[in-house]
Regions:
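Conserved hydrolase catalytic core segment
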Residues: 77-98
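Glycine-rich, phosphate-binding/catalytic loops in enzymes
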Residues: 32-35, 58-61, 98
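Conserved HGGG/HGGXW glycine-rich cap/lid loop of the alpha/beta-hydrolase fold
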Residues: 7-54
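N-terminal cap/lid segment of alpha/beta-hydrolase-fold proteins
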Residues: 1-3
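Active-site loop/oxyanion-hole signature of alpha/beta-hydrolase fold enzymes
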Residues: 42-82
Length: 98
């Protein structure tokens, strides 16, 4: 199972930020730096984006599974989710399923 790349900043409750189409986690670094006093911010690169793995398979079901695997791998129990555009749909579908 391949894991998504992320940059983790700060301390506190985990906040996972999921970027939009053609973006990557670095797009949110400036905002993340303003949240690090209150949150452990995870700037996630979705599959086929940034430094995460590339795959011929690419759909929302798989991106939700990738996010779930990421949360399990990092042993996160309760998370805050923030998604933009494609990342917004990914986190909404994740919230419905899990």
């Amino acid at each position: 199972m391949q894991q998504l790349h992320s940059r983790i900043l700060g301390e506190g409750d985990p906040l996972l930020i999921v970027h939009g189409y053609f973006g990557n986690g670095d797009n949110w670094k400036t905002i993340a730096n303003n949240l690090t006093d209150s949150f452990e911010v995870h700037l996630i690169d979705q599959r086929n984006h940034g430094r995460s793995f590339h795959s011929d398979e690419f759909d929302y079901e798989l991106m939700v599974e990738d996010l779930h695997n990421y949360i399990q791998y990092h042993q996160l129990k309760k998370v805050h989710l923030l998604g933009h555009s494609m990342g917004g749909k990914t986190v909404m579908l994740y919230a419905v399923e899990f």
